């Protein structure tokens, strides 16, 4: 490298910088700068024309002043003049000033564009590079209008130099990001894809970035990039560490390019079998390399290697189809959880969060629970602890909820203030979601209030009240527990609120005990009264009037309190009004009227949990969706056992903040009607309606996705660049309920958003679907939910189709996917002994009752995975029934409204031939046929 | 893609800023101030990544100078960390064991090197040779023209 001509090109600049550095105070600096600004201004305005060098120097000084944090409002014109200089350095400084200082809406753009046009046409690669850089830096619409047509030509022209190609690719990418509508797709797109084969790795690197972004929005057009990317990746990962020369970074071959290629592949579903095999090999090689001893001790080596590894794991998770790879990924991350590098621990926690949502790896993730809990206790960096909290939340299910909730609670005592509120919300959600025993739930929430009362938002304490009111089995316990908690000399105001409300409703349930007699309850609450804020006092006054109804014996005491000046003449209007009205009510109303007016609160109608909504708001919709998906209870999926009461999964409305419990000011409380059933106002799917607009053909890849849901109930059904559709479903006997989540991935609204369920004529009599329309507007980044109630009337073969139509940015979108409601969802597993099994097997020996299929294995033949799939399919897996231990047998009953059909199945793997034989026997031919079809596709 | 890159000193003086998405001056200043505070408050052994607003921040300290990049949710943290390192290597090679003063006095060169390496928030070329060759050529061009 030649000795750099640092600054000696511009002495004046160096002097000025030194001056600034020598300034003793901020004031001195500002003074010096103002002097310089005045000087430059006068030079620019002066009569004497400035030479190029001086212009360059002054423009550079302005840049420096700008970097110091001062506003620069002149000099732009001079910079633009520099652009047309034919001295390279002057041109360069001119471009630098513009790329740093010019905003995209500047009036100068037209002048700048002119200069750029000249440089692009100059065929001088250095000048072209400067011009392309400037376009990429400013990236305004006007620039896109001027150059978006031109740059693709530069990019794919045969005689363009490599360095210019690289710049052109990234420049086009920038324009596409800001103004996609102005970048015309055309012949060049296919030629751009072929840049993935280019000899120059720098060109491939730049092109891959461009292709990835283009492919996200136009997947069909760039489909061919998948196989090219896989073969490129394969060549990189199998190359020796020196093959790629300067593109090898600390013994890692082309890490940037590898990461980009893996990223590109994440725009697509798993490729066709041929390409897929090669990709799987690549991914395995990457995973294997992680186990090899490092080729260098430098952190750069391990960082680059692990960057590729993490991206490979992201791809594996994205595909979510290769159980072996998923489990290996999980094990690898498990190792990182204990790594001495904080960075790797952080990333492993983050990555595992997404792994926890995959059916195949959820269990594997759960085995790391102790390590994660330990991280929560010992990590010194709050951002790592935050990741640990997220992961615990993601891996939580019914089996480990008590442990995770307990650990989160104990962490909460010392947690950083910045993340307390979030932890409180998470604990509240988990406690509710996985509560088998609602006394545990009540205890947990009261603990939350005790430990972190200030961070317990209204949503959380409203929620505990809603749940207690809706579940009569826990009311007595709740009353007793709050009564005890209130004994503490200092308790959080939120506890007083919860305690006041619950005792007001259910204090009678513990009044039999002389230690908590009505009078004691009242005095206990009233002892807190004067320490509380106005809203809490208002709530307590309502509790008192409820006591008047529950316990006539304390009526005089309460009337005395209400009558006291501090109530009747309270300065606060709300308190005064309540005192006056309650006192009057207690005096004039007969016992019957009191009993009616002050009746126990009716159950709250079910709605989406307000706590979950709040967490979503805090974390942004997308992150929580994933977490939400992960929290489904796998133990239910796997055992297919009876499901616990669904009350815990969805939630309830919140009372208004001022909590006028009685509604005395307005109408008397509505009679406790049942929550509106979804059937009542549900929109029956009208298959005969011919007014429906044209339905799109099934989206590509929809078949694959459909097959993935046969053995599982939750996950992502469909995803393109605009929309993500997630599913959560539960089935019980012949009934089911499916939650469909539509996520808007863009930042723009979807309008006229209309999902429609379509059942064919054959399907319609056999499967009943009911749902309600969703809000026709879906905000950018938002998610809407639709519930489908499902009834299986009789056995069926076809699947319903979900058609979604909406407008996005002026264009009409129309998507159809098969909804994975399959016959096997209505399976109830049946356990039976070997003898019974074979007896029944023989009874079903009629040729029409048996269907058999012999087929080649499409996935690795892993016993554990196979077992999980059979259980996921819904039948019981019968151990020690088949004389050959390698075979699998299952039994279950398909429940339909009209009939129940017993099913027996037997799967015989042949490892050598990599084949399976699947035999289904049921009492109905069509059922055997359909189940055999569905299950065969899984192995 | 990378949203922006900042170089600032331990004392909280901004040395270089490069924005890859149009952002108003006011917003830039606010973000710089906020992020510098967050990063400077972190202790040495802490992890190099943090969540900040809706972005991921990757930073590393070299002597008195912090290099700090904001990337998007899907981007790879570790490769960004090495991107910073590669940039430092490029500066080092060009200036010959670079120090903060080199960047202060030759900030325009620091920009030129960064521009050869990154464009529009994505890596343009990861080869040290290619990037340095481009810069060398530009320097040569400067000298030739200076002589002419």
From Swiss-Prot, chain A:
Composition bias type Low complexity, residue spans: 646-667
Keywords: Cell membrane, Coated pit, Endocytosis, Lipid-binding, Membrane, Protein transport, Transport
Regions of compositional bias (Pro residues) in chain numbering: 668-677
Expression sites by tissue: Expressed in the brain (at protein level).
Xref: Gene3D superfamilies: 2.60.40.1230, Leucine-rich Repeat Variant (1.25.10.10), TATA-Binding Protein (3.30.310.10)
Matching Pfam families: Adaptin_N, Alpha_adaptin_C, Alpha_adaptinC2
One BP annotation, GO: vesicle-mediated transport
Subcellular location: Cell membrane; Membrane, Coated pit
MF terms in GO: clathrin adaptor activity; disordered domain specific binding; lipid binding; protein kinase binding
Keyword Transferase (UniProt): no
InterPro entries: Adaptor_Complx_Large_Subunit, AP2_complex_asu, ARM-like, ARM-type_fold, Clathrin/coatomer_adapt-like_N, Clathrin_a-adaptin_app_sub_C, Clathrin_a/b/g-adaptin_app_Ig, Clathrin_app_Ig-like_sf
Topology with respect to the bilayer: Peripheral membrane protein
Cellular component, GO annotation: AP-2 adaptor complex; clathrin-coated endocytic vesicle; clathrin-coated endocytic vesicle membrane; cytoplasmic side of plasma membrane; cytoplasmic vesicle; cytosol; endocytic vesicle membrane; endolysosome membrane
Region of interest (Disordered), ranges: 612-681
Binding of a 1,2-diacyl-sn-glycero-3-phospho-(1D-myo-inositol-3,4,5-trisphosphate), residues: 11-12, 43, 53, 57-61
Subunit structure: Adaptor protein complex 2 (AP-2) is a heterotetramer composed of two large adaptins (alpha-type subunit AP2A1 or AP2A2 and beta-type subunit AP2B1), a medium adaptin (mu-type subunit AP2M1) and a small adaptin (sigma-type subunit AP2S1). Binds EPN1, EPS15, AMPH, SNAP91 and BIN1. Interacts with HIP1. Interacts with DGKD. Interacts with DENND1A, DENND1B and DENND1C. Interacts with FCHO1 and DAB2. Interacts with ATAT1; this interaction is required for efficient alpha-tubulin acetylation by ATAT1. Interacts with KIAA1107.
Stated role: Component of the adaptor protein complex 2 (AP-2). Adaptor protein complexes function in protein transport via transport vesicles in different membrane traffic pathways. Adaptor protein complexes are vesicle coat components and appear to be involved in cargo selection and vesicle formation. AP-2 is involved in clathrin-dependent endocytosis in which cargo proteins are incorporated into vesicles surrounded by clathrin (clathrin-coated vesicles, CCVs) which are destined for fusion with the early endosome.
Family assignment from sequence similarity: Belongs to the adaptor complexes large subunit family.
Protein name per its UniProtKB record: AP-2 complex subunit alpha-2
Organism: Homo sapiens
Gene it is expressed from: AP2A2
């Amino acid at each position: 490298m030649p000795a750099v001509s640092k600054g000696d090109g511009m002495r004046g600049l160096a002097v000025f910088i030194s001056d600034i550095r020598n300034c003793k105070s901020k004031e001195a600096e500002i003074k010096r700068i103002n002097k310089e600004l005045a000087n430059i201004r006068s030079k620019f305005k002066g009569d004497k024309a400035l030479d190029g060098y001086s212009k360059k120097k002054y423009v550079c000084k302005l840049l420096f002043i700008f970097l110091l944090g001062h506003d620069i409002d002149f000099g732009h014109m001079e910079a633009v003049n520099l652009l047309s200089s034919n001295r390279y350095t002057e041109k360069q400084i001119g471009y630098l000033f513009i790329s740093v200082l010019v905003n995209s809406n500047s009036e100068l753009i037209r002048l700048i564009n002119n200069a750029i046009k000249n440089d692009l046409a100059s065929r001088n690669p250095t000048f072209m590079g400067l011009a392309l850089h400037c376009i990429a830096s400013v990236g305004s619409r006007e620039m896109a209008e001027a150059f978006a047509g031109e740059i693709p030509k530069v990019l794919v022209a045969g005689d363009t130099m490599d360095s210019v190609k690289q710049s052109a690719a990234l420049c086009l990418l920038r324009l596409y990001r800001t103004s996609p509508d102005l970048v015309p797709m055309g012949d060049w797109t296919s030629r751009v894809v072929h840049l993935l084969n280019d000899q120059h790795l720098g060109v491939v690197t730049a092109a891959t970035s461009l292709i990835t972004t283009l492919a996200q929005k136009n997947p069909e057009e760039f489909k061919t990039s998948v196989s090219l990317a896989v073969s490129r990746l394969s060549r990189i990962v199998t190359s020796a560490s020196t093959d790629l020369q300067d593109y090898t970074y600390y013994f890692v071959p082309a890490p940037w390019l590898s990461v980009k290629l893996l990223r590109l592949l994440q725009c697509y579903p798993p490729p066709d079998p041929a390409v897929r095999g090669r990709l799987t090999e690549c991914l395995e090689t990457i995973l294997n390399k992680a186990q090899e001893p490092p080729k260098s001790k430098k952190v750069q080596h391990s960082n680059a290697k692990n960057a590729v590894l993490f991206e490979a794991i992201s791809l594996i998770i994205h595909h979510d189809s290769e159980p072996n790879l998923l489990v290996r990924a999980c094990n690898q991350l498990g190792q990182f959880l204990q790594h001495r590098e904080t960075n790797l621990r952080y990333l492993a926690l983050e990555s595992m969060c997404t792994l926890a949502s995959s059916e195949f790896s959820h269990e594997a993730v759960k085995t790391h629970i102790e390590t994660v809990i330990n991280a929560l206790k010992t990590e010194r960096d709050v951002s790592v602890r935050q990741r640990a909290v997220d992961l615990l939340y993601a891996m939580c299910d019914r089996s480990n909820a008590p442990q995770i909730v307990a650990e989160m609670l104990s962490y909460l005592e010392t947690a950083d203030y910045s993340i307390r509120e979030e932890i409180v919300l998470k604990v509240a959600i988990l406690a509710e979601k996985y509560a088998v025993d609602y006394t545990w739930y009540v205890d947990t929430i009261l603990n939350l209030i005790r430990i972190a009362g200030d961070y317990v938002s209204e949503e959380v304490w409203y929620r505990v009240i809603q749940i207690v009111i809706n579940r009569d089995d826990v009311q007595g316990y709740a009353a007793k527990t709050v009564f005890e908690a209130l004994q503490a000399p200092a308790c959080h105001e939120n506890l007083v609120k919860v305690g006041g409300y619950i005792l007001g409703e259910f204090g009678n349930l513990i009044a039999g005990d002389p230690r908590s007699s009505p009078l004691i309850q009242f005095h206990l609450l009233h002892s807190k009264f004067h320490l509380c804020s106005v809203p809490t006092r208002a709530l307590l006054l309502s509790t008192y009037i409820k006591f008047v109804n529950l316990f006539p014996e304390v009526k005089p005491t309460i009337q005395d309190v209400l009558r006291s000046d501090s109530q009747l003449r309270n300065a606060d209007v709300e308190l005064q009004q309540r005192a006056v009205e309650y006192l009057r009510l207690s005096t004039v109303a007969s016992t019957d009227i009191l009993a009616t007016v002050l009746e126990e609160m009716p159950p709250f109608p079910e709605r989406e949990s307000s706590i979950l909504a709040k967490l979503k708001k805090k974390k942004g919709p997308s992150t929580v969706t994933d977490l939400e998906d992960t929290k489904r209870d796998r133990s239910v999926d796997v055992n297919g056992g009876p499901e616990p009461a669904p009350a815990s999964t969805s939630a309830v409305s919140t009372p208004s903040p001022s909590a006028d419990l009685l509604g005395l000011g307005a109408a008397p409380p509505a009679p406790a009607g049942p929550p509106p059933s979804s059937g009542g106002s549900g929109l029956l799917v009208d298959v005969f309606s011919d007014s429906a607009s044209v339905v799109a053909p099934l989206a590509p890849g929809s078949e694959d996705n459909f097959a993935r849901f046969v053995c599982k109930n939750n996950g992502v059904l469909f995803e393109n660049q605009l929309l993500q559709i997630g599913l959560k479903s539960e089935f019980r006997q012949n009934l089911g309920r499916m939650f469909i989540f539509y996520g808007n991935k863009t930042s723009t609204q979807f309008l006229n958003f209309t999902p429609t369920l379509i059942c064919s004529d054959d399907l319609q009599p056999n499967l009943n679907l009911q749902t309600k329309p969703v809000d026709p507007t879906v905000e950018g980044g938002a998610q809407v939910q639709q519930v489908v109630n499902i009834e299986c009337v009789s056995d069926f073969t076809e699947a319903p189709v979900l058609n979604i139509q909406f407008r996005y940015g002026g264009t009409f979108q129309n998507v159809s996917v098969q909804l994975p409601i399959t016959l096997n969802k209505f399976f109830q597993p049946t356990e039976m002994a070997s003898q019974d099994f074979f007896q029944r097997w023989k009874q079903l020996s009629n040729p029409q009752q048996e269907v058999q299929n012999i087929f080649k294995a499409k996935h690795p033949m892993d016993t554990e995975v196979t077992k999980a799939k059979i259980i996921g399919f819904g039948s019981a897996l019968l151990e020690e029934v088949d004389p050959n231990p390698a075979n699998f047998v299952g039994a279950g009953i398909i429940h339909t409204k009209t009939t129940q059909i017993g099913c027996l199945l037997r799967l015989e793997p042949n490892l050598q031939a990599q084949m399976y034989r699947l035999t289904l026997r049921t009492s109905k031919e069509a059922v055997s046929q359909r189940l055999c079809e569905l299950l065969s596709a899984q192995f | 893609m990378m949203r922006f890159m900042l170089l600032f000193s331990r004392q909280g003086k901004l040395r270089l800023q490069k924005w890859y998405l149009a952002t108003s001056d006011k917003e830039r200043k606010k973000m710089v101030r906020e992020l510098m505070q967050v990063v400077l408050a972190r202790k040495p052994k802490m992890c190099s990544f943090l969540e900040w607003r809706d972005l991921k921040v990757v930073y590393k300290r070299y002597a008195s100078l912090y290099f700090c990049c904001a990337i998007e949710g899907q981007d790879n943290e570790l490769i960004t960390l090495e991107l910073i390192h590669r940039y430092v290597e490029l500066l080092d090679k060009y200036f010959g064991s670079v120090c903060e003063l080199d960047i202060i006095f030759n900030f325009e060169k620091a920009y030129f090197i960064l521009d050869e390496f990154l464009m529009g928030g994505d890596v343009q070329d990861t080869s040290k040779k290619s990037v340095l060759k481009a810069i060398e050529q530009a320097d040569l061009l400067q000298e030739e023209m200076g002589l002419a």
